[in-house]
Every structure is written in structure tokens, then in C-alpha cells.
Amino acid sequence: NLNALRDWGHARDYVEMMWLMLQQDKPDDYVIATGHQYSVRDFITTAAKHLGITIAWQGEGVDEVGIIDAFDESIIAEKLINEGTDKDFIARTQLSHLKDIAREVALNPRLKPGNVIVRVSPHYFRPTEVETLLGDPSKAHEKLGWQPKVKFAELVQEMMDNDFIEARRECLCKHAGFSVAAYID
């Protein structure tokens, strides 16, 4: 459900709050949340932007789709070649493979403006789906002085960076002739 609203928060912030709770002289109940909501659509839009993809949304409900409005392939190429990897290691072993992969990504016909890259699947709808989840952390703010540090866009970026490192590793293995397990879901 692309309209589902969630209170997205980072585990690092939540663990800090738990630690602060444990430092209190007297036990008490607190809501661990950011107090801010974003839709699943917001999450997808932010994640795609991190990869240089701008999504235009069309339709409603199960007929809603996300269509590539624009794609700046230089962003993925930059991430492939420069992010999260030891530069000396790249220089010795991976650079030519990564450049080949970056070219393949740029030429991928599925990543062209006008193509659908997000489609709602009724398979994932839950009969008891809660449309909106929002916590009120005001007591934690007041009594513990706790504030979440990681903003929504940073959370999405961190998740995308981690997934991108894994995907890059798989691409390098495939490009070098190794078999890679297929993942579904």
C-alpha cells in the first residue's frame, strides 16, 4: 500500500533511547518513535532519487504505478566506482569490471524514462493493514532529553547505500563469471 504512513526511524536512535531509559532511577514507559510520518511512496521516491531516478506516479490504489520520469545514470556510475570501496583494491582488481557494469546500467532498457519500475501487488496487501502508524515521543523528549538524530532521508540513504554495496558485490561476481543466488521478495 503506497499510501500507508509509517513512523520510520533508525535503530541507532532507538537503541540510544533504550539506553537512556535504562539510566533512569525509576522505571517508566516511553514511546520509541520519531513523531514524523512518511508514506511508502515517499520512501520509494527518496530511495530512487538516491540512485538518480526521478519517479512520476500515475493511477490510484492497486492501479498506481511509478514511472521513470528521468534517470541520471552518472549517479549510479559514480556510486559503482567510488563509494564504499578501498581505492587501492579497486585500482588493482575491480575498476575495469565496475566501468563495464556502469556502462551496462546506463544502457539497461528497463531504466529509460517512461518505463514502469514500481507496481502495486495485491499479494502484499494485508487484511488487517493499519493505514497510519505514528508514535508520540514527547515524553522521551521531555524526561530523557532524547531526540532522534537520523532524518528520514538519511535513513533511506543509509539503507540504499548498504543494499547498493551488496548489489555491486553481486554484479562484480557475476561479471567475473561466478554464480550468484537469485533473491525473490
Q: Where in this protein do the model-derived segments appear?
A:
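C-terminal substrate-binding subdomain of Rossmann-fold SDR/epimerase-dehydratase oxidoreductases
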Residues: N1-D185
